[in-house]
Structures are given as structure tokens and as C-alpha cells.
């Protein structure tokens, strides 16, 4: 059985822990408990082969900026998460999380995950958010951000579990097929004659 280490990063309260609990227990936590550091494990089959997916949940709060990178060595894949209802968490993908991950573990595959995807189809929630002048991060913006950081973009909902399995299957695929999923930009060359 191949072991794969997946570290999950992103701002506090974007839904990282809920996503991990939803995936590993098929349940949704009833209350918010900030994470300092937690581990989960999922054994699964993909394409007829067994994998042990070690899921490392990290704290997004600034207080843990010096502690969090201690979980980065030997990481096979990172999930950088943001909430589709938080522009600030979306902006921090590049201004904080990608910089941090790329500094400590350059070249490790990244999957960008937009959490709380269920809200896209919930007109009541969208209306309440608009009343508070909160706009959803458009799906296309997620795709653009993923391209910018050379990542794959997926959206998921811990509440409905929509897209959750895809996220973690993609974690494994990005490790076992690293060159098939992320197209690196071709280097431009100049020939002088």
C-alpha cells in the first residue's frame, strides 16, 4: 500500500477541518472548533490499487505561522483551501499560502479547493450574503487563480459532500501521475543565428 501525505492549508474558518471530517467520517461537525494541528487517515482504493492517505490539518491563524511549516517536510501534495464566500481567503491563496508552501516545499503538487460550494445553489444564502455586500468568488476566478499557481482547481461542500471524493481522489492522482495533470508552461527560447 502506497502512503501519501497530504497537508491542508488555508485561512482559519474556511472549512478545512469540516472537509476532512466529512471525508473521513461521512458526517458534518456541528460546531466550529479551531484547529491547532490534527491528523486523519483514509485508506482507499483508486484504479484497483490501495492507498493510505495521511491528511494533515493545519491552523490557518497567524499565531501558528511559525509552527505550521513543521508539518511540510515529506509532503506529497498540498490542498490550499479558500471559502467561496470570502474574498479575503481567496486573495490569501497567492499572497500567503502559495508563497509559504512554495518556499518550504517547492515543486510539490497543489490542488486549490474552493470550499462551501453548496452555497452556489442556495438562493436564500446568496440573498443573505448580498444583503451584507458579500459576493461569491466566481468559479472562473478559481480556475484563473489555479492556473496562476500551477494547480488544479476543484470546489467541494463538506455539508453536502458534493465534490469531496473528487478532491481526495485528485490528491492521489496528482502524486501517482504528476506530469499528466498539471501542464507546466513551456519555456520560451531564443535562437540567435
Curated annotation (Swiss-Prot):
Coiled-coil ranges per UniProt: none
Q: Which residues are removed as the propeptide when the protein matures?
A: 191-193
- Which keywords fit this entry according to its UniProt record? GTP-binding, Lipoprotein, Membrane, Methylation, Nucleotide-binding, Prenylation
Origin superkingdom: Eukaryota
Primary site of residence? membrane
* Positions where Cysteine methyl ester occurs in the chain: 190
The membrane-topology field of this record reads: Lipid-anchor
Q: Annotated motif Effector region: location in the chain?
A: 32-40
One cellular component term (GO) for this entry is:
cytoskeleton
Q: Name one GO molecular function term.
A: GTPase activity
Task: Write out the GO biological process terms.
Answer: actin filament organization; cortical cytoskeleton organization; establishment or maintenance of cell polarity; mitotic cytokinesis; regulation of actin cytoskeleton organization; regulation of cell shape; response to imidacloprid; sexual reproduction
Region forming the signal peptide: none
Gene3D superfamilies, per this entry? P-loop containing nucleotide triphosphate hydrolases
Q: Which residues bind GTP?
A: 10-17, 57-61, 115-118
Name the InterPro entries for this protein. P-loop_NTPase, Small_GTP-bd, Small_GTPase, Small_GTPase_Rho
Q: Where is the lipid attached (S-geranylgeranyl cysteine)?
A: 190
The compartments listed are:
Membrane
Q: What does this protein do?
A: Might act in concert and/or share functions with other members of the RHO family in the regulation of a subset of cytoskeletal rearrangements that are required for these processes.
Q: What's this protein's family per the entry?
A: Belongs to the small GTPase superfamily. Rho family.
Could you describe the subunit structure of this protein? Interacts with pakB.
- What is this protein identified as? Rho-related protein racF1
Amino acid at each position: 500500500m502506497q502512503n501519501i501525505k497530504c497537508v491542508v492549508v488555508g485561512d482559519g474558518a474556511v472549512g478545512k477541518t469540516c472537509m476532512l471530517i466529512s471525508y473521513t467520517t461521512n458526517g458534518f461537525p456541528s460546531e466550529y472548533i479551531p484547529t491547532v494541528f490534527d491528523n486523519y487517515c483514509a485508506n482507499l482504493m483508486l484504479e484497483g490499487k490501495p492507498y493510505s492517505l495521511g491528511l494533515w490539518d493545519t491552523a490557518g491563524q497567524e499565531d501558528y505561522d511559525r509552527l505550521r511549516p513543521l508539518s511540510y517536510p515529506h509532503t506529497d501534495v498540498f490542498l490550499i483551501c479558500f471559502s467561496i464566500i470570502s474574498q479575503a481567503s481567496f486573495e490569501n491563496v497567492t499572497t500567503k499560502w502559495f508563497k509559504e508552501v512554495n518556499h518550504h516545499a517547492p515543486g510539490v503538487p497543489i490542488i486549490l479547493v474552493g470550499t462551501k460550494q453548496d452555497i452556489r445553489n442556495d438562493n436564500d444564502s446568496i440573498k443573505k450574503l448580498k444583503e451584507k455586500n458579500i459576493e461569491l468568488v466566481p468559479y472562473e476566478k478559481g480556475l484563473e487563480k489555479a492556473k496562476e499557481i500551477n494547480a488544479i482547481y476543484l470546489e467541494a461542500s463538506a455539508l453536502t459532500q458534493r465534490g469531496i471524493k473528487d478532491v481526495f481522489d485528485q490528491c492521489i492522482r496528482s502524486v501517482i501521475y504528476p506530469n499528466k495533470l498539471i501542464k507546466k508552461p513551456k519555456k520560451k527560447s531564443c535562437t540567435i543565428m
